[in-house]
Amino acid sequence: MSKKRVVAIASGYFNPVHKGHIELFERAKEVADVLIVIVNNDKQRELKGSKEFQSEAERCKIIQSLKAVDGVLLSVDEDRTVRESLKLLYERYKKIEMMGGEHSVEHKLLFVNGGDQFSNTVAERDVCMEYGIYMIDGMGGKIQSSSWLLSETK
């Protein structure tokens, strides 16, 4: 007999993490059994033109410590998207066989967006459509911004 589990995937730079990110994670976890967070790597941060506030290792450690988060994946992508990371997670979660396949677990994947990202404009839309990853907007409003916080420290 097959079981279904919902896996929400959120992504971002989290440089630094703030209360808007926390709300995104908490709201995503309300609709999912598992929450995986893709943390954009330092190369992506440089491509974005953002100054380092925290290294990728620090950001991953902080995100992993949050109660709502079940797992963290440091982005494998070389551009500013998380397309390849989404493909990797799709392969990991599309179907996990346990006990000889009799008790398989199927996963419904959700790519969740916060207050300033929308499924009709995100660069990952094509991958989500191709792989059957559902996109959900509005998982937390634009409460705060890492850019705002960093500009206030100047």
For each predicted feature, which ranges?
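Nucleotidyltransferase catalytic core that binds NTPs
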Residues: M1-K154
